[in-house]
């Protein structure tokens, strides 16, 4: 019995030793044989052989084992990387070379800010006494203020660079604009302002002599002048042309293009809603429309007296006419340039523009080959230009033959051009300010 127990114990001890030897063999020799299987992923091209770098082999093999938290670790790494990029982005966004405040004291200021700069205003209520907004373009940070409460001497001036937007169309407006310029002049003299530019709604006859003494080239302090209409002063050095834009004073909105605006069949060939002046080209236009019966194919609504403000109903009718017409007829008024041109562009309705120079001192065709509408023409406006309304019947006959798909492409082209036009103006305006104001700072 004792012998049997002794043999059993010896057998168990021998079995234990064999198992230990097997385990040791597996630990020291088995893992080495596994190395080639892991090498395609664990060892990169040009890595040292396993025999020479056992320590590296060990860590490489361990790194190739499946890690259940690998996905979470990668996500965390990506999150950290994203966060660092956001921090960097925020830090660079705040870095601007120039701060400019725009004082909007004419309705054209809203076209500049909301339509060209695509800026927002707080509050959004158009009747608010004080409205403001901010935007960054290029290296310039803009702030914009407007409203009846923006009065000379009644708000704090804590900027060095100002763009003043004024209305100089008639005597009463000129008097008001002059008060603002005298206020700005005083700020420059006491060194509260360093640089000043003016955006001016000029006179429709281009009679703007009143502002001449304020220009820097004439000994004044206004470094840059952006002026509406084809002024003969425009030289693209210190006087630049600026567009009239839409009638923001009549609450014409910022229009977002829609699928239906582009693709729907429009029921009217053309539209004209406006005031008819006696012995004017507008009267000639109406006669031509009626003569050929095209007034029945177009949305036409004429009135005898100009109205400075629209009712909600009349504004909606006008917008519907633009939206539902392929062409918008744009006869000259006191000046060739009119709000209707830009409003038609907003709705993808091709402007048919009476391309004739009106009376007054605006740029003449013998000196300025692009006049009238130099700015629009220089930027490739895809309009239909005619010299006489007698050409209109032929235009409308051609329009009747154009299929919907061609009209869709034409609308796309017009809307894309108009967006590009506004973007280019924003960048050009900013580049001019930066070049002038920053250069003068260095000198």
Swiss-Prot record:
Pathway: Protein modification; protein glycosylation. Residues 50-59 have a biased composition (Basic and acidic residues). Disulfide bonds: none annotated. Residues 35-76 are annotated as: Disordered. InterPro entries: RXYLT1-like. It is a single-pass type II membrane protein. GO terms for cellular component: Golgi apparatus; Golgi membrane; nucleoplasm; plasma membrane. GO terms for molecular function: ribitol beta-1,4-xylosyltransferase activity. It is found in: Golgi apparatus membrane. It is an enzyme of class 2 (transferase). Its EC number is 2.4.2.61. It holds the Pfam family RXYLT1_N. Forms a complex composed of FKTN/fukutin, FKRP and RXYLT1/TMEM5. PANTHER family: RIBITOL-5-PHOSPHATE XYLOSYLTRANSFERASE 1. This is Ribitol-5-phosphate xylosyltransferase 1. It comes from Homo sapiens.
């Amino acid at each position: 019995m004792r012998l049997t127990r002794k043999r059993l114990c010896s057998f168990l001890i021998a079995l234990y030793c064999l198992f230990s030897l097997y385990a040791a063999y597996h630990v020291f020799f088995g893992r080495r044989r596994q190395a080639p299987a892991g090498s395609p992923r664990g060892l990169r091209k040009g890595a040292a052989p396993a025999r020479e770098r056992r320590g590296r082999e060990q860590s490489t093999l361990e790194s190739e084992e499946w890690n259940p938290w690998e996905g979470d670790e990668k996500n965390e790494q990506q999150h950290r990387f994203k966060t660092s990029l956001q921090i960097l982005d925020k830090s660079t966004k705040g870095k601007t070379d120039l701060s400019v405040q725009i004082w909007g004291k004419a309705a054209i200021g809203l076209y500049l800010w909301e339509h060209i700069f695509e800026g927002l205003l707080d509050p959004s209520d158009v009747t608010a006494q004080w409205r403001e907004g901010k935007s960054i373009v290029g290296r310039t940070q803009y702030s914009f203020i407007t409203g009846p409460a923006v009065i000379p001497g009644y708000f704090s001036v804590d900027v060095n660079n100002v763009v003043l937007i004024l209305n100089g169309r008639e005597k009463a407006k000129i008097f008001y604009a002059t008060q603002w310029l005298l206020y700005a002049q005083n700020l420059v003299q006491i060194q509260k302002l360093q640089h000043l530019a003016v955006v001016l709604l000029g006179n429709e006859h281009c009679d703007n002599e009143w502002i001449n003494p304020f220009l820097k080239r004439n000994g004044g302090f206004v470094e840059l002048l952006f002026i509406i209409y084809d002024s003969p002063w425009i030289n693209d050095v210190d006087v630049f042309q600026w567009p009239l834009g839409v009638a923001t004073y009549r609450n014409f909105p910022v229009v977002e293009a829609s699928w239906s605006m582009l693709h729907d069949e429009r029921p009217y060939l053309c539209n004209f809603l406006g005031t008819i002046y006696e012995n004017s080209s507008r009267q000639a236009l109406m006669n031509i429309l009626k003569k050929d019966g095209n007034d029945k194919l177009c949305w036409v609504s004429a009135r005898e007296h100009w109205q400075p403000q629209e009712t909600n109903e009349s504004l909606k009718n006008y917008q519907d006419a633009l939206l539902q017409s392929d062409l918008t007829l744009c006869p000259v008024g006191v000046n060739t340039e009119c709000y209707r041109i830009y409003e038609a562009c907003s709705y993808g309705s091709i402007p048919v523009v009476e391309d004739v120079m009106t009376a007054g001192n605006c740029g003449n065709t013998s000196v300025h080959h692009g006049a009238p509408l130099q700015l629009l023409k220089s930027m490739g406006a895809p309009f239909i230009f005619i010299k006489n309304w007698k050409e209109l019947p032929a235009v409308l006959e051609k329009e009747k033959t154009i299929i919907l798909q061609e009209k869709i492409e034409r609308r796309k082209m017009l809307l894309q051009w108009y967006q590009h036009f506004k973007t280019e103006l924003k960048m050009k305006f900013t580049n001019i300010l930066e070049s002038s104001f920053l250069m003068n700072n260095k000198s």
